[in-house]
Amino acid sequence: MTHPSTLPDARPSSDRFRCGGRERDFLAATPPHSPAPIPALAGPDAAGAKANPSVISLKYPLWITASLGLLAVTQTAKAADPVDAKFVRTYFATHCVRCHGEKKQSGHLRLDTLAFNFADQTIGEQWGEVLTQVNGGDMPPKKEQSRPSAVENAGVVEWIATELKKGETARMAARGPVSHFRLSRNEYGNIVHDLLGVRFDVDQPGLFNEDTRWRGFENIGSVLTLSPSHIEKYFNAAEAVVSIAVPEKVAPPAITRQNATKLAGGAKNRLVERSGQVRHLAFMGSARRIYSNGVNGNEVKVRAQVSALVPAGGAAPRLTFYADNQPQPIFDREILSPEDKPIVVEFDAAVVEITMRVHGTSRLDQKNPQPFDDEGKPKEPLLLIDWIETEAPYVTEEGKKKRESLVPVDPENAAEVRKTLHRFTERAWRRPVTDAEIADYVKLIESEKKAGESFRSAYRAALTAILASRNFIFIQEGAAKERRERINDWELASRLSFFLWGSMPDDELSTAARAGELRKPEVLRKQFARLLADPKSGRFTKAFPRQWLQLQNVGMFPPDKKLYPEYDRHLEASMIQETTDFFAEVFRENLPIREFLTSDWTMMNRRLATHYGMSAEGQDFVRVKLRPEDHRGGLLTQAAILTLTSDGTRHRPINRGVWIAEVMLGATIPPPPPNVEPLNLTRPDAGKSTLRMQLDAHATTASCLACHSKIDPLGFAFEAYDAIGRWRAVDRPSNFREPVGNAKEPQFPVNASGVLTDGRKFDGAEEFKRLMVEDLDRFAETLVKNLATFALRRAMTFDDEAEIKKIAAASRSDQYRLRTVLANLVTSDLFQKR
């Protein structure tokens, strides 16, 4: 991995880039006042972002109390003899090593060789697990005849907690003075839009490397490293967006309209006269490129006048547009308007190429279609297109204002040039900039002008260098010349805006930071409320649930077309949108977070309603009241969650159990032990038993029981839902190879019952969800932990657990309403720590 000092602002003078058609030296483009070298792992506590297989907490999340005053020690007695490392080692040898020693390591934890180096993050995590188990009375096991006394346990707990606190202090002291976090792809695109008024497609193939994810999160500093391939791509991207925002000459938009005849492309069977007008006839399989030769970042406005012919009892056709051969559409809508009342649909996008497709039928002959019967009625869903119009380049009024503010009105006024450049750089770098830093960019402009470039070309070179700087690409916290544990006002402004907007602070937030006012509680609360009310908070309501719930995995294993013919991209997109819109509704209405576990409503469009066996009008997502017989409510019974925990062929109870344990309960699930025989779903007798039956038999093995008893029940609660989230009353053999309804295979009653490790029983998803609600405090702490991970861009460790519990506890009196939880997080000490 190349050191980030090789970014353009730190290149030696021999390194050159091409800009504006010729080579340019960027050494002078960047001030010498660059931050301290960026570590190979860009975020603090890099070790905290690595899964530690030696540490497990299968039953509950790892809640560690880091303060002696908060220890939940039930015993008040003190150890008679002073407790030290020797005492603890003897304690382990007497009570623990039989199960956690050389011959046996239950839970992948070995204590006879556990080091006493509490400053080490990994070792500290293991000691934290020991503290949790001893303090909770779970270890040593109650069945052991020779158990330690309450006095011994209290002494060991107090000693471990003290040493853990010392270890935390040592790690803080050892942390570097500066932390850097690379922008994610989506954040880069958001900033470019907010700063330059350019909508840049960061997902375009070949533009940027895909961001490495850690447990679903895409913004974790320790895994968003900088490779050599990134550097050139960042420069090219900066040059591209600046050339669009500050062109040599602003070109007027060109409007191109394709009428029905042109759309038909000479194919007479694609033209039809309906309602006195010649129209282009489109049906399933119809595909046409309607826009090409665009430039990434230049927006195009697309308008189309369309109507539909829907057969009696049939579905409506869907008009879909795809960009740059991407699998997900940029526009997808059912067309319901009759032929005598066509509608105009429109959208805008920043893409290079747009292809139109129509979905709705698959039974017409593509070469010689006969779409109408003898009475002129449609046999299949058909789309009538009167015309399609494109307008490019398309710039919104807001975008025009942003772009106009980038360039000084009077290029000959040196003071105005410096002032405009200073404001842009301060906004781009999200911190105060010095006159010396700006002077280097002014010199670059003058150098370019002397070389014969126009002012706008020279100015573009300066803006490009600013955006190619690591000061832009990395979020910096801390300072090389001072060692501090808390972030300053400017860093707090960035942390808040990236958390809620996925982008840079705006002028009002920066003004509060510049005045040194933002860390004042009343100012911070006011700014927090303002950011929530801004439409840009919609980025948070999409990004956080997508990453927290790992919705990127929906469609990773596309369902078998033979087994699930109804599954398509439209359904997949609807599944994901149900979940993100559900989160957004809880956010918007400030509902209690128990709604995530169980609710009497969901968000739904007609496509998803059909999938659920329900009814809903229209293609837009709306809030729908649920009935008990709908078998829905909360996140866990949404199709997106049920699908991402399946494998494309069948549902996977173990996958579902692991997902619930890790995502909803914050537990750490260890890998399966070596040499475990996998289930054979194709063995001769597989047709006589369900997957549940085979798992029950598998879990009776002694080596499997310990883990499966904690994982499997969580997944068994959702046995009544198949691999694509449909509810079912009967189960199927584990080796099924035909779609639902195959009369030849035997049927079995669904068994969705289970017993949790604490002895509580349930039968079905609804009873299980009620048990989850009983443990609402635990879920609240897990949610806070995930929110903090997203906000602070790093993995939470046991050093953070006391603060996480404090944030959750402060939200309890308001029923854990989501905005209350967010407010308590933002105003917490944790949020302002480096």
Which residues does each predicted region cover?
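Short polybasic linear motifs
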Residues: A46-A49, I388
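Bacterial N-terminal signal peptides
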Residues: P61-A72
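Sequence context surrounding c-type heme c attachment/ligation sites in exported
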Residues: T74, A79-E129, G136-A150, A609, ...
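Aromatic- and Gly/Pro-enriched helix-to-coil junctions and flexible linker segments
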Residues: A77-T256, S362-V409, E426-K443, S447, ...
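Conserved structured core elements
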Residues: K86, T90, G124, G128, ...
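Extended surface/linker regions that mediate inter-domain or inter-protein docking
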Residues: W159, S179, E187, I191-L196, ...
